[in-house]
């Protein structure tokens, strides 16, 4: 059964933005969070898997997402875009606030089913990427690794880059690893198949 038969992925809208739990939606709809470095392509990932051009605002300027953005998908699922980490031009105080906001959501939200952790397929994961993965594993939060910008890596080097990313993360082979490109539309079905396993 395809994701379209289970939910209409094109029936999506931004629901609200929240700074803390008092602003979270008050229902039991399952949520999948999206985490990753600033400019890793979270907004492009959201727009691509939902078949929309600008539902999530993309920006070449890192640090654009400053709140938890909740996207309603067919009244059956929410995608939650959390602020990108690792953006150096944000003040320490602002980084600390973002960190607290993300940690509060990830560790206390009952609706959370899994986290899509996005990494840049072109490069070795950053220390922030590694810490995020370790954080999710420590709290036993199901994690899906999505390696973005695969179109920038020649296909003949994909195996090498996948091995590099997995080795750096000390990757748990029971977790999903998806190679993704919003430009070439690679990994969309695999992303949905994996997300739907957690609903």
Curated annotation (Swiss-Prot):
InterPro entries in the cross-refs: G_ENGB_dom, GTP-bd, GTP-bd_ribosome_bio_YsxC, P-loop_NTPase, Small_GTP-bd
Residues that hold Mg(2+) according to the record: 43, 65
Cofactor(s) recorded in Swiss-Prot or TrEMBL: Mg(2+)
Signal peptide feature range: none
Any single GO BP term: division septum assembly
Family annotation (Gene3D superfamilies): P-loop containing nucleotide triphosphate hydrolases (3.40.50.300)
Highest taxon, organism lineage: Bacteria
SUPFAM superfamilies, alphabetized: P-loop containing nucleoside triphosphate hydrolases (SSF52540)
Protein name (database record): Probable GTP-binding protein EngB
UniProt organism field: Streptococcus equi subsp. zooepidemicus (strain H70)
Gene: engB
């Amino acid at each position: 059964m395809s994701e379209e038969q289970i939910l209409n992925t094109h029936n999506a809208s931004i629901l609200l933005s929240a700074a803390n739990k008092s602003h979270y939606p008050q229902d039991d709809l399952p949520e999948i969070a999206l985490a990753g470095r600033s400019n890793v392509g979270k907004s492009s990932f959201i727009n691509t898997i939902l078949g929309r051009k600008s539902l999530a605002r993309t920006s070449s300027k890192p640090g654009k997402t400053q709140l938890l953005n909740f996207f309603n998908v067919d009244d059956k699922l929410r995608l939650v875009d959390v602020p990108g980490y690792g953006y150096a031009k944000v003040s320490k105080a602002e980084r600390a606030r973002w960190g607290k906001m993300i940690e509060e959501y990830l560790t206390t939200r009952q609706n959370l089913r899994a986290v899509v952790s996005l990494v840049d397929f072109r490069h070795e994961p950053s220390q922030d990427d590694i810490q995020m993965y370790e954080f999710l594993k420590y709290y036993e939060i199901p994690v899906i690794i999505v390696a973005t910008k695969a179109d920038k890596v020649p296909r003949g080097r994909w195996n090498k880059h996948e091995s590099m990313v997995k080795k750096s993360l000390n990757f748990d082979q029971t977790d999903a690893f998806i190679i993704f490109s919003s430009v070439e539309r690679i990994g969309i079905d695999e992303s949905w198949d994996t997300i739907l396993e957690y609903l």
